[in-house]
Each structure stands twice: as C-alpha cells, then as structure tokens.
C-alpha cells in the first residue's frame, strides 16, 4: 500500500471510530452509570480531543460527543452544592513559590475569550487562558533562583479527566504535556499545558495545592526559544447543556494562597 493510501486508510478508520463513539454515547443513560466508569469517561474524553485535533470529526459531532460525556462526568461527581468560594484556601496559586503579581503574564491582559471554539480547529486567534511565567532565562526547566524544578500545583480540587505525558520535542502538537481536571464544585474543567513531567493519572482525585506536574516547555510553540517558560492555565465552565464556556480566572488567581 502506498503512503497516500495508508494515510487515507488511517483517516477513514478514525472517522468510523468517531462515528461509532457518538452513536454509542447517544444511548447512555446518565442516571444509571456507576462511579467506576470514570476511566471509560476519561478514555472517551481523550478520544474526542484527538478526533478534534486530527480533524476527523465535525465540530457539531464533536460538541454532541463532548456534551454526552461531560453530562456523565457531571452526574457522577457534581452534587449541586454551593462552592465555598469565600474560603481563602479554595484556590492555591498553581506555581509553587511564585506570587500571582509576579507570575501572571500581562497583568491579566493576555486573556482573550472572543471567538473561542473548542470543537473547531480552524478557529484561531482567541486565548481564553492566563500564562503564568517563571524565572528560567536559560530555558532548562529549572528555577534560576533555586536550581530546582518548579512544581505545578492543582489550582482547585477535582478529578483528573485526562493527561498527556509523552510529548516529544519534534511534535507539532501545541499543548505539549497537558492535564485536564474537572472541579465538581465549580462545575468546570481546568486545563494545564506545557508541563515537563506529569505526576497524575486519569481517574485520580487531587486536592488544591497537590503537586500535579513540573513546569516545562512542551508544545510546538512553547518549546521554541522565543517563548519564555510558562504554564498555560485555562478554565472552561460547563453551561446547563454541559457545553464549555471560557471563564476568566484572573480574580481567583490574584486572591489564591501561595505555597512556598
């Protein structure tokens, strides 16, 4: 089989798998799914993300698949209780040993949610996230002040939905080594990108302030010399239909506690 033939075959198979995924999920009943199916939800979540990335699923189909899967996750963990947002310990600044005043890029002005579409790879230009910078001028993933790796901490408590650990420097994937964590209280997902070493697994519960990774430069653009070492932090709030809407975490970050 020629290279072009193999490529067409792989693309066709991915489309078939994506369609089977959507059809299968359409028959799920969120009221009868036990908690021990979280790993299945995690696998489905990752597959949807990969299908979107590889453009083997339409944006509408991706949105429907995401919606059904997140409804299942929400039904498993979200109990509708009010978040203890007034508690100063709810948010822990994600970079150990750094303050939000010194770390948040552009004093929060780098956040741009307009035009964001998680399900369409052709939509570009938005940046519904904050980049958190560290002291690493020689770009070796080590703090210039301590000569040690920089710990990335869970901003809030939640369940790890998916994680990537195997990014390679010659990959064109932009997120690098990433982590998705669902916070049942906030009913939304946090995305931590460009990590070096990831220490958590899908299905694992983490508490605010737990170490989840070490700061890195993984990702197609983040790896380049022009990019300072940083953590890319995004929050997607689930609306009533379990679809993602970007949320600005700047105030939460500014009022979070700092771990030294």
Positions of the model-derived regions?
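Conserved, short, structured surface segments that act as functional micro-motifs
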Residues: 172-181, 204-260
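Zn2+-dependent peptidoglycan hydrolase active-site motif and core
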Residues: 147-149, 153-196, 226-230
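Short, well-structured beta-strand-loop connectors
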Residues: 151-163, 200-215
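Sec-dependent N-terminal signal peptides
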Residues: 16-25
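Polar/charged, compositionally biased leader and regulatory segments
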Residues: 28-151, 250-260
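N-terminal secretory signal peptides that target proteins for export/translocation
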Residues: 1-13
């Amino acid at each position: 089989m020629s290279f072009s033939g193999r490529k067409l075959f792989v693309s066709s198979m991915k489309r078939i798998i994506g369609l089977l995924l959507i059809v299968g999920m359409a028959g799920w009943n969120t009221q009868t799914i036990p908690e021990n199916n979280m790993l299945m939800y995690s696998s489905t979540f990752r597959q949807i993300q990969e299908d979107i990335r590889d453009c083997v699923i339409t944006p509408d189909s991706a949105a429907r698949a995401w919606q059904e899967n997140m409804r299942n996750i929400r039904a498993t963990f979200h109990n509708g209780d009010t978040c203890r947002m007034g508690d100063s310990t709810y948010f822990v600044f994600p970079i150990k040993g750094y303050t939000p005043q010194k770390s948040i890029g552009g004093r929060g002005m780098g956040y741009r949610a307009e035009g964001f579409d998680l399900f369409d790879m052709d939509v570009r230009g938005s940046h519904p996230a904050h980049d958190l910078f560290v002291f690493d001028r020689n770009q070796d993933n080590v703090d210039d002040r301590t000569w040690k790796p920089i710990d990335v901490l869970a901003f809030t408590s939640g369940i790890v939905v998916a994680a990537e650990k195997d990014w390679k420097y010659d990959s064109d994937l932009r997120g690098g080594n990433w982590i998705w964590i669902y916070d049942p209280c906030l009913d939304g997902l946090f995305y931590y990108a460009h990590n070096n070493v990831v220490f958590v697994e899908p299905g694992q519960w983490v508490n605010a302030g737990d170490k989840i990774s070490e700061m890195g430069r993984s990702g197609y653009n983040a790896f380049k010399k022009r990019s300072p070492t940083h953590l890319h932090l995004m929050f997607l709030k689930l609306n009533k239909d379990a679809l993602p809407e970007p949320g600005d975490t700047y105030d939460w970050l500014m009022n979070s506690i700092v771990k030294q």
